[in-house]
Amino acid sequence: MVASRTSADGGMETSYGFRDVAEGEKQGLVNDVFHKVAKRYDIMNDVMSAGMHRVWKDALIAALNPRKDAGYKVLDVAGGTGDIAFRIIEASRRLAHATVLDINGSMLGVGQERAQKKGLSDNLTFVEANAEALPFEANQFDAYTIAFGIRNVPRIDVALSEAYRVLKRGGRLLVLEFSEVQMPLLDRFYDQWSFKAIPRFGKMITGEAEPYQYLVESIRKFPNQQDFAAMITKAGFSKVSFTNYTGGIAALHSGWKI
């Protein structure tokens, strides 16, 4: 489970894959990973999920069911390439507005290029900022989404508290993330796929194996479904629930600001 802890020298440590690193060091390491894979990020997700991430993202949008009006505002965090935000805008019949926030400029650059090509720029705002210190006043958004990004945040509890702060009363949090497999046979297959196949395919596709190795390890260090639900509740959210997909390979967590 990802959690900050005190190191032998009194500093705060967290997990970077299977390594323990200083809390302040993790963000730079994660940024380097995503600078390397930004232009092939969607291919990376295809490799890591055998294409299933597209189905899971569709399930997130179905759960969100964005309102079809111009006043509906969504904050999509760690959403640099725009994949979730584009789906939200289309599901709202191009009426909603999405703010895409990412700490990585390379990822945002890809998203902005894609938005222009899709003709969605008027519905989108791109912001380079940290999920742990959102540059928005309280009670601004109707929904907060984050897909396959929360496990890369050094202080997940802080990010969840920030999500709660910027949501309006009645606003909804939706977190899609790789999670703990619930089926023993699938678990063994998934381990083999993750640790042996994914880094190899990653190197073939992008020339880089290390980013994929980190991402695989980071999944194993992320809290399981129940523990992450407890973290969301601790941040102040109500009616917290989760839905497993593909035997628990991924899970969608939901919470409300009441």
Swiss-Prot record:
Pathway: Quinol/quinone metabolism; menaquinone biosynthesis; menaquinol from 1,4-dihydroxy-2-naphthoate: step 2/2; Cofactor biosynthesis; ubiquinone biosynthesis
Xref: InterPro entries: SAM-dependent_MTases_sf (IPR029063), UbiE/COQ5_MeTrFase (IPR004033), UbiE/COQ5_MeTrFase_CS (IPR023576)
Pfam families, per the entry: Ubie_methyltran
Binding annotation for S-adenosyl-L-methionine: T81, D102, N130, A131
Highest taxon of source: Bacteria
Top-level EC class: transferase
Catalytically driven reaction(s): a 2-demethylmenaquinol + S-adenosyl-L-methionine = a menaquinol + S-adenosyl-L-homocysteine + H(+); a 2-methoxy-6-(all-trans-polyprenyl)benzene-1,4-diol + S-adenosyl-L-methionine = a 5-methoxy-2-methyl-3-(all-trans-polyprenyl)benzene-1,4-diol + S-adenosyl-L-homocysteine + H(+)
Family of the protein in this entry: Belongs to the class I-like SAM-binding methyltransferase superfamily. MenG/UbiE family.
Protein name: Ubiquinone/menaquinone biosynthesis C-methyltransferase UbiE
Annotated source species: Allorhizobium ampelinum (strain ATCC BAA-846 / DSM 112012 / S4) (Agrobacterium vitis (strain S4))
